[in-house]
Regions:
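Positively charged N-terminal leader segments that act as targeting/secretion signals
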Residues: 1-9, 72
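Surface-exposed beta-strand edges and their flanking turn/coil or helix-capping segments
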Residues: 32-36, 75-78, 109-120
Length: 191
């Protein structure tokens, strides 16, 4: 299994980055798996994906953060659920990562997330609101990059593939089926 998840040396050293994903590809996956996250939640709401968690068979695995909710404070971190705390205020929960919702994407469907173009992704009531949102994204990404989340993603992938009956595995998206769909989508694009 380890050789299946080996990343190129470049990816091993790469820090996580915010990325955009072709919405048509996401809709394609959602026809089969309703838990594929959304980026667009209306004019004033937007959540980019991040990655690259790891690469497998020419596909990138990516995921997304979710806004912290009061109920998240009571939940324990597990192999598929991680809390993201503000590095400057270590008790302040700012986001959570549901790794069980990570999924594969053809490399051709990943696009850079440009902070200076944030106004094209969502609306803001003021420059101050826009600046605060960009600051939050920077803080979240800094925290994520301190968590070794790529290694944790590979471990979860291995658990799901090797022990599908494990309680954590049952909460995960069917990674193998998503890989099949991703490769199928890639093939349809070439036609």
């Amino acid at each position: 299994m380890e050789e299946l998840l080996s990343a190129s040396p470049l990816l091993l050293e790469q820090k996580m980055k915010w990325i955009n994903v072709n919405e048509q590809y996401l809709d394609y996956l959602r026809k089969v798996e309703k838990r594929i996250p959304r980026t667009d939640y209306g004019e004033d709401r937007y959540k980019p994906f991040f990655g690259i968690l790891f690469e497998k068979d020419g596909l990138y695995y990516i995921t997304q953060v979710s806004h912290a909710q009061p109920r998240h404070n009571k939940l324990k971190q597990q192999k598929d659920f991680y809390k993201v705390y503000d590095p400057k205020s270590p008790t302040r929960l700012i986001a959570v990562i549901n790794l069980n919702y990570m999924f594969p994407i053809p490399k051709s469907e990943v696009f850079p997330f440009e902070k200076n173009q944030i106004h094209t992704y969502r609306t803001f009531t003021s420059e101050k609101e826009k600046s605060k949102y960009i600051d939050l994204l920077d803080i979240e990404l800094s925290a994520i990059n301190s968590m070794d989340i790529g290694t944790k993603a590979k471990e979860l992938y291995s658990l799901k593939c090797n022990k599908p009956e494990h309680v954590v595995s049952k909460r995960c998206i069917d990674f193998k089926n998503m890989e099949r769909l991703a490769l199928q989508y890639k093939g349809e694009e070439k036609s």
